[in-house]
């Protein structure tokens, strides 16, 4: 691929990644403001145009009044209040459409112009398919709160968020494959140091770094899933103290074995797991970050410091979110923090894959 195509594709992937990150943020706002069930229909094309006239708004409001959320929770809501939550959900859906178009259309153009390698076609086709599935997944999630209960199914919410994170992950990975920022830097450093050989010890160290980094990425995905389950269950609104849950570190519901441990729909259990699994991952990340810093290789040392700082901020925002009964700003910062930590480890993965170039 020539340099102009690399630059164009890089800009496209950066814009797509930033849009997806914004989508995750707006999705968090939608959840925290309880606006997700304000639009009770899914019209991918005609839904682009919002209500304009008073008649349009009355029609939308009448549709909403037939929903479980209105009948069981918001039956005193005014049309002005309805407009507020409607526009939050509308912006979320509109941004989803824009993000989908920005990802899919350029891919089709690149494919038509034969600017992609075979492997790139497969990877970008996968991303395109995931984006389309995500649109259906969003409606599948919303639909769960429009029938009998005025609540979105928390497992579907977790699936919706995880799919967004997977797409984000794939976009970052594709961007790093194309521009190879760390590899270029390390090649230059390697040539300057006249390094002509790679020892067995270096290869073994590289393998350990790659394996542990992949384990951390998997654990981060798992923790993000638990965070989504906590959000979907409103489990952050119980036991709002730290480190105890009630009178002890382990809540009485668990001590009394009154929880069905095969289920993911118990508020107490989900909050307990999200708390302490998060602490466990944070300790692991800090240890790994210290290791990267001790290795004293410039690219790794910097990323190790970034990872350590981010995880300390993440623990702090998590505790603030819990203790202060889920304030929107703290909760959003906590959600974005998880994505930034994941991004950091995707960058670290790119570095350690070319670790021998540092020697």
Swiss-Prot record:
It is an enzyme of class 1 (oxidoreductase). Keywords: Cell membrane, Heme biosynthesis, Iron, Membrane, Metal-binding, Oxidoreductase, Transmembrane, Transmembrane helix. Its cofactor is heme b. It is a multi-pass membrane protein. Heme binds at residues 274, 334. Its EC number is 1.17.99.9. Pfam families: COX15-CtaA. It is found in: Cell membrane. GO terms for biological process: heme A biosynthetic process. It catalyses: Fe(II)-heme o + 2 A + H2O = Fe(II)-heme a + 2 AH2. It comes from the Bacteria. Pathway: Porphyrin-containing compound metabolism; heme A biosynthesis; heme A from heme O: step 1/1. The chain crosses the membrane at residues 8-28, 94-114, 124-144, 159-179, 215-235, 276-296, 303-323, 328-348. GO terms for cellular component: plasma membrane. Interacts with CtaB. Belongs to the COX15/CtaA family. Type 2 subfamily. Catalyzes the conversion of heme O to heme A by two successive hydroxylations of the methyl group at C8. The first hydroxylation forms heme I, the second hydroxylation results in an unstable dihydroxymethyl group, which spontaneously dehydrates, resulting in the formyl group of heme A. This is Heme A synthase. It comes from Orientia tsutsugamushi (strain Ikeda). The gene is ctaA.
